[in-house]
Amino acid sequence: NTILIVVVGTLSSTIMTAIGAYVMSRKPFPFQKAMMLMMIFTMYFSGGMIPDYILRNNWLHLGNNRLVLILPALVSTYNLIVMRTGFAAIPDSLEESARIDGASEFTILMRIIIPVALPCMAVIILFYAVSYWNSWFEASIYLTDRKKYPLQVILREILIVNSTTEMQVGESGNAQAIGESIKYATIMVATVPILLIYPFLQKYFVKGIMVGAVKG
């Protein structure tokens, strides 16, 4: 479940973020600033837990569906702004030469913008992967079928059961040792997969952060 959510969510979010960032980074269009302000507004203010639950469960009918963990978080405003800044740093002359050769907007995005901004894309992919991998709160609320639980929810349940067992057994040395071992094991299980991915993206990470943070 976790691998499926991370892979599908990361790919979908990266594609949608790249499309949105490309549109927002090109020549100004009507209501562009208003749209950007609306996106930034969502970074600081949310509708709250109850309206969010009603939206996902009653209106979108995503209750007990893995898509409930992907669709509402499909595009991160912060990642969109970072990628938009990275795309905006690419010279317009590259696009103009491609348009002269008859390239469409989609071709320009896939053949020119994304390859040039690959370091920035790698950073965004890592951000989304870590976000989906660590997500557990939404799953604990919207998923009722244990077969659909991601790894983080299972690890959380293990820690809760372990804490309850420690309280029942008492503060004996063996109980504490077992409890600490379980905690360290869950930390390793939750952390190692991301640590294995990072070395492959490390060469892009610093460069991508700089491209996305500084224009020009």
Give short role names for the model-derived ranges.
Residues 1-216:
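A hydrophobic, multi-pass inner-membrane permease signature
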